[in-house]
């Protein structure tokens, strides 16, 4: 049976078109920088993007709230809440055309795990593309208040005796993260291992969706967890636990979430992919301004986004950290970064580290061709084209796809030109 498509003009259609035009005009006035539909316009006006209720999803939320997708010719973009990173993966596997999603606010390693079929049903590869990094820093490693007397902060070894005692009593020690092989998994593993605690032998790692972390610690389901904000802040505000360290203390200026898309969507809609990216980049610039933090906290706190009190978002967003163990730091540089200093640009060297760490913990084979994989997934070339069309100053566009050597809190150095040497320098690992 043929599908009949009618194109009659309705009053509702006229009103919708007029409303969209008015929105675009208003947004152009509020955000005068950048080009609108430079060259050929977007092939489509819609895309379905997923997000998890984490502060680093702010660029997608702000792009939607401020009409930036519409400004760049895509007024029908939908930003849809996902229940977990597993749900994000499953909906990306489906794709937008099958009632899933086309792209997402995503853990930076997850596109690689999907691209290679490591975390998909029947290990079926789902080609993925990284278009941008969404943020740096401001995740947290938090601990149940029963461990407050250990004085644990950056040095996780202070937990070793307490963990050993608990296990001797026949109890399980649980470390929670949000997705195997994701950023939170890698941060908590790095922190534990640096303190001499083997995350595969000395504790049990469990997966808990970000919005469920606080409730699960409240009922004693885990001893320590790693998650993004606002959940560490909420944990402290509710008096359930304390933050031992923020991830910026482990690796200052570390990459965190990415804007990931299905590769087939990007290939089919290259102009739309660039338009989406330009909207997100403008939103990142807005998010990065300290004067916008209170408004951003209020936006994110809305029911349709995070449904949390704005105060659970605001403090750490501004670099004010109440660790919950008597330690309070104000005006720190550990706040979440969204733009300045090349944050949005997806450095290939950063993806190289994520892959090296997942080799360390057995997610990828030691002989994985890291460079080939990064070149397949990381489309920093699209970011450069979008930046040019957006009018980003040449000085703000990184000259190289490598940020060079990275140094961690325990003195370890990662050279992206020699991941094997880095892996050889590590004591606790699965990879041999």
What is the meaning of each model-derived region?
Residues 56, 65, 88, 184-187, ...:
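Stable alpha-helical elements in mature extracytoplasmic
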Residues 1-13, 20-28, 36:
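N-terminal secretory signal peptides
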Residues 38-207, 219-233, 240-253, 415-421:
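Short, glycine-/small- and polar/acidic-enriched structural segments
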Residues 352-432:
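Conserved C-terminal helix/tail region of periplasmic/extracytoplasmic solute-binding proteins
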Residues 269-381:
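Secondary-structure end/capping motifs
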Residues 141-142, 258-261, 265-266:
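Short glycine- and hydrophobic/aromatic-rich loop-to-beta-strand nucleating segment
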Residues 101-102, 201-243, 262, 294, ...:
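Ligand-binding pocket segment of bilobal, Venus flytrap-like solute-binding proteins
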């Amino acid at each position: 049976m043929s599908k009949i498509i009618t194109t009659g003009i309705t009053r509702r259609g006229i009103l919708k078109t007029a409303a969209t035009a008015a929105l675009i005009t208003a947004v152009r006035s509020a955000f005068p920088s950048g080009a609108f539909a430079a060259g050929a316009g977007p092939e489509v006006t819609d895309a379905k993007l997923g997000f998890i209720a984490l502060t680093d999803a702010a660029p997608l939320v702000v792009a939607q709230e401020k009409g930036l997708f519409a400004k760049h010719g895509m007024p029908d973009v939908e930003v849809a809440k996902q229940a977990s990173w597993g749900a994000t993966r499953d909906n990306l596997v489906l794709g937008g055309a099958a009632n899933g999603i086309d792209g997402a606010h995503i853990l930076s390693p997850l596109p690689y795990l999907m691209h290679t079929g490591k975390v998909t049903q029947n290990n079926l590869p789902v080609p993925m593309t990284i278009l941008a990094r969404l943020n740096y820093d401001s995740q947290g490693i938090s601990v149940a208040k029963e461990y407050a007397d250990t004085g644990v902060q950056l040095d996780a070894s202070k937990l070793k005796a307490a963990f050993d005692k608990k296990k001797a009593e026949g109890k399980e020690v649980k470390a929670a993260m949000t997705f195997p092989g994701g950023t939170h998994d890698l941060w908590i593993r790095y922190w534990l291992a640096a303190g001499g605690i083997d995350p595969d032998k000395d504790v049990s790692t469990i997966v808990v969706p970000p919005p469920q972390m606080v409730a699960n610690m409240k009922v004693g389901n885990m001893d320590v967890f790693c998650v993004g904000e606002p959940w560490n802040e909420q944990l402290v505000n509710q008096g359930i636990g304390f933050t031992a360290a923020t991830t910026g203390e482990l690796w200052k200026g570390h990459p965190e979430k990415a804007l990931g898309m299905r590769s087939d969507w990007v290939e089919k809609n290259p102009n739309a992919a660039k338009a989406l990216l330009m909207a997100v980049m403008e939103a990142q610039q807005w998010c990065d301004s300290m004067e916008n933090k209170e408004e951003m906290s209020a936006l994110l706190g809305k029911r349709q986004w995070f449904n949390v009190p704005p105060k659970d978002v605001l403090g750490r967003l501004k670099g004010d950290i109440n660790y919950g163990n008597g330690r309070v730091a104000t005006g720190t540089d550990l706040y979440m970064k969204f733009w300045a200093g090349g944050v949005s640009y997806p450095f290939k060297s950063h993806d190289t580290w994520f892959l090296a760490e997942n080799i360390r913990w057995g997610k990828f084979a030691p002989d994985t061709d890291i460079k080939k994989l990064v070149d397949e997934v990381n489309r920093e070339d699209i970011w450069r084209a979008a930046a040019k069309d957006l009018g980003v100053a040449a000085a703000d566009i990184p000259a190289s796809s490598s940020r060079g050597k990275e140094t961690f809190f325990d003195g370890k150095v990662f050279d992206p030109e020699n991941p094997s040497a880095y892996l050889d320098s590590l004591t606790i690992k699965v990879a041999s």
